[in-house]
């Protein structure tokens, strides 16, 4: 039996006139060769105990917790364990001696994986002796732009030699190409995070079909990384806020509704358990006004969410624990409004209904205690809502947890719809959001001053003329304006509309700038139409066709809500539908005129089911060609966005960017009206773009994409950049609604399309290669 550890080798960049073979050298172990026995292990032979093969070898695509867990660590296995007898592994994992012996062939820099006769179809297993050193030398060789990622923009040799497990690391094979090398970097980074110093690594894990790899990571890793659940030990960390940098924001802080004493005591206990965390706990008043919310800007905090009682099965001790929820990712580390709905779709698809159900519970809690579904659960969002999706979300969770056959599911559905009806009446059908003349609703949040969660310089171009007018610095002007010490009606109007834009979820876009609070939009009114239809259905099916509102005492039946839906549909057609263009436009309630901004939100009318068959046909024929790009639907047309300049910078919710919510709702809406082939075509475009970025850019999955770029669609230079792009070594979260879009988009793909995506076949060449009968599947 060997008594030392094998080594990994790398290839250095070739010198002139040398293609690289002479530059191969072993990675140094960083220490003297050392015994492969557990520390403290006694010498001498033990009787061999036969172990099952399942105990020894795992699915190469196991979760990281299993794959890099202690049971696969050679240093933690007994001397008799096969993982600690690497020389004998060839008995179980045969690799051709011919292949292993052929090391004297020329290494070439290629952009693809090694598909030569020396390849073994991903069945090989590697042995890496020193994970830290392997990481350092891999990055030194391949990460030429020094961003801790291996991408197509790096100019390294794109090849490395890795020792095989069967040969105890003495024989080597090549790992080639950006995709495999970046996957190797990711796996080494993950292994290091688990404290591993040595690993066995299946080639199949770094040469995995990229479509399978991404969907697997979303389901098994990304959702886990994005899931939060408040308990006594993590609340201080969850409460921290990277968006606010003021002295009062240094300490984590939690605000609790005035009528939740049990939660208040829970958080006090958490603060006392670890005083060094400096967790501050405060009650909110019964009446929350815009003035009060502004007063919290210097001392922002997390808002309490729904909790349930947990009983320790061992001790019988009772304690509170938060329902689970998912956060979008990046700088967004809270429970967001419409992000949560879109993530719930993916969570349900991934059989993680407990998290989706938890978010329904949180929305019920928010409506009950904060009067609305919040933009997110931070104190500075108390006056601001987001696009309402609760009814559809509750119905999806209801069906997933047993539907009408589960009494608990029925109770959850009823509670969710009581909350949704309250939200409908008190938020969307009340002043200032309801326009009494048209009967349609607008995004129109309350608030005073400058939104504190924005970047410090976000509004500098707007504020600079006022700073010059008062002869003060921008910082001083912000203070004077927020404190009401200067009065500027135009600035007040600007921030009124800016807050409305943020409530819309589309922050920011030129279609809303300076007018949002006055616009009756097709997106919001489509959602409210869906609320009315869903409420009518649930009242009929689960309330005995009679619903008594506990807040205002009114009694309604399903017919009442159907009438409301039909009335809204009539008003939408009157004020928004434009047959000539095939778009539902927005209606300016102040100027009493229809806008002409061509937006992808026109497809929300199909998702909600309010468009007629003829309107859907016209939308597909006229509006769709204006919005369909290389990578799917663009947020708006270039014509509507207008010219871009230093004084008129690009906005992230405008051309040329595409967003997952627009794709998801359009796919479902088109399918509902018989245009599933169109949805399939759009889905292929969107999935191609995500897959290409994932393959070429170190497993990157980002918040939004430039749907006009074929090479680097993840590169978005607008406003605060692109969440999900800034990571070292490995991306562990993706981005919430993009994760969902990938899983849902794959449901439209047949095997042929999945193979094309895995090969990163661009949409047009792929579509052109199809047979006439196959083109029909994509409405071509």
Curated annotation (Swiss-Prot):
Modified residues (Phosphothreonine): 88
Entry-annotated residues carrying Phosphoserine: 52-53, 112
Active-site residues per Swiss-Prot or TrEMBL entry: 507 (proton donor/acceptor), 703 (proton donor/acceptor)
EC number: 3.2.1.28
Gene Ontology terms describing biological process: trehalose catabolic process
Signal peptide (UniProt feature, chain positions): none
NADP listed as a keyword: no
InterPro entries: 6-hairpin_glycosidase_sf, 6hp_glycosidase-like_sf, Glyco_hydro_37, Glyco_hydro_37_CS, Trehalase_Ca-bd
Residues engaged in binding substrate: 331, 338-339, 375, 384-386, 505
PROSITE patterns the UniProt entry points to: TREHALASE_1 (PS00927), TREHALASE_2 (PS00928)
The entry's keywords: Glycosidase, Hydrolase, Phosphoprotein
Recorded catalytic activity of this chain's protein: alpha,alpha-trehalose + H2O = alpha-D-glucose + beta-D-glucose
Top EC class, one word: hydrolase
UniProt KW Hydrolase keyword: yes
GO MF, one example: calcium ion binding
Annotated segments matching region Disordered: 1-48
GO cellular component annotations of the record: cytoplasm; mitochondrion
Additional comment: Present with 2500 molecules/cell in log phase SD medium.
Family: Belongs to the glycosyl hydrolase 37 family.
Protein name as it appears in the record: Probable trehalase
Native organism taxonomy: Eukaryota, Fungi, Dikarya, Ascomycota, Saccharomycotina
């Amino acid at each position: 039996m060997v008594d030392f550890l094998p080594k990994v080798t790398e290839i250095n960049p070739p010198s002139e006139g040398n293609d690289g073979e002479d530059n191969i050298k072993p990675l140094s172990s960083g220490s003297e060769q050392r015994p492969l026995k557990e520390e403290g292990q006694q010498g001498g032979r033990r009787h061999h105990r036969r172990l099952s093969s399942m105990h020894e070898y795992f699915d190469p695509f196991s979760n990281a917790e299993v794959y890099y867990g202690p049971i696969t660590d050679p240093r933690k296995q007994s001397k008799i364990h096969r993982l600690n007898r690497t020389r004998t592994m060839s008995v179980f994992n045969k690799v051709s001696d011919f292949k292993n012996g052929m090391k004297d062939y020329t290494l070439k820099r290629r952009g693809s994986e090694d598909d030569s006769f020396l390849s073994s179809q991903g069945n090989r297993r590697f042995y890496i002796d020193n994970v830290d050193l392997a990481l350092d030398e891999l990055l030194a060789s391949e990460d030429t732009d020094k961003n801790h990622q291996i991408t197509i923009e790096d100019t390294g040799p794109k090849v490395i030699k890795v020792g095989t497990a069967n040969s105890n690391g003495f024989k080597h094979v090549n790992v080639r190409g950006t995709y495999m090398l970046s996957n190797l970097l990711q796996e080494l980074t993950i292994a290091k995070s688990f404290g591993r110093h040595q690993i066995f690594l299946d080639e199949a894990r770094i040469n995995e079909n990229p479509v399978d790899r991404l969907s697997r990571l979303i389901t098994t890793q990304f959702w886990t990384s994005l899931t939060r659940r408040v308990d006594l030990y993590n609340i201080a960390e969850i409460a921290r806020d990277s968006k606010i940098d003021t002295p009062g924001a240094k300490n984590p802080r939690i605000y609790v509704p005035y009528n939740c004493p049990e939660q208040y005591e829970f958080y006090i206990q958490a603060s006392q358990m670890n005083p060094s965390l400096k967790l501050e706990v405060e009650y909110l008043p019964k009446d929350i006004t815009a003035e009060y919310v502004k007063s919290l800007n210097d001392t922002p905090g997390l808002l309490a969410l729904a909790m349930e009682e947990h009983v320790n099965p061992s001790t019988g001790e009772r304690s509170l624990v938060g329902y689970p929820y998912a956060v979008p990712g990046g700088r967004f580390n809270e429970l967001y409004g419409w992000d949560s709905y879109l993530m719930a779709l993916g969570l349900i698809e991934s059989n993680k209904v407990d998290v989706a159900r938890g978010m329904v519970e949180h929305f019920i809690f928010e409506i009950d205690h904060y009067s609305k579904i919040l933009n997110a659960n931070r104190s500075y969002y108390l006056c601001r809502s987001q696009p309402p999706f609760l009814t559809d979300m509750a119905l999806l969770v209801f069906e997933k947890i047993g539907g009408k056959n589960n009494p608990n599911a029925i109770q959850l559905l009823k509670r969710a719809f009581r909350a949704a009806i309250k939200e409908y009446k008190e938020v969307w059908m009340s002043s200032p959001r309801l326009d009494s003349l048209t009967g349609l609703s607008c995004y129109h949040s309350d608030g005073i001053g400058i939104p504190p969660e924005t970047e410090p310089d976000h509004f500098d171009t707007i504020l600079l003329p006022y700073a010059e007018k008062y002869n003060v610095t921008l910082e001083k002007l912000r203070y004077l304006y927020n404190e009401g010490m200067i009065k500027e009606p135009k600035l007040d109007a600007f921030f009124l509309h800016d807050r409305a834009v943020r409530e819309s979820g589309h922050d920011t876009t030129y279609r809303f700038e300076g007018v949002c609070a006055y616009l009756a939009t097709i997106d919001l009114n489509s959602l409210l139409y869906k609320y009315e239809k869903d409420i009518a259905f649930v009242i009929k099916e689960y309330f005995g066709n009679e619903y008594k509102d506990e807040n205002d005492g009114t009694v309604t039946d399903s017919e009442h809500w159907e009438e409301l839906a039909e009335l809204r549909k009539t008003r939408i057609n009157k004020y928004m539908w434009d047959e000539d263009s095939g778009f539902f436009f927005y209606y300016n309630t102040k100027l009493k005129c229809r806008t002409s901004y061509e937006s992808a939100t026109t497809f929300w009318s199909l998702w909600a089911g309010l468009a007629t068959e003829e309107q859907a046909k016209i939308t597909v024929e006229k509006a769709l060609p204006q919005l369909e790009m290389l990578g799917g639907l663009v947020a708006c047309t270039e014509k509507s966005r207008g010219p871009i300049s230093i004084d008129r910078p690009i906005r992230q919710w405008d051309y040329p960017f595409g967003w997952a919510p627009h794709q998801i709702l359009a796919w479902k809406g088109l399918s509902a009206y018989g245009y599933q082939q169109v949805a399939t075509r759009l889905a292929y475009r969107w999935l191609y773009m995500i897959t290409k970025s994932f393959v070429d850019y170190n497993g990157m999955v980002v918040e939004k994409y430039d749907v006009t770029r074929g090479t680097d669609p993840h590169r978005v230079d607008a406003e605060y950049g692109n969440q999900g792009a800034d990571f070292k070594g490995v991306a562990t979260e993706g981005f919430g609604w993009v994760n969902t879009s990938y899983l849902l988009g794959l449901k439209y793909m047949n095997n042929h399309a999945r193979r094309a995506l895995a090969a990163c076949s661009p949409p047009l060449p792929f579509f052109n290669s199809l047979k006439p009968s196959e083109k029909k599947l994509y409405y071509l």
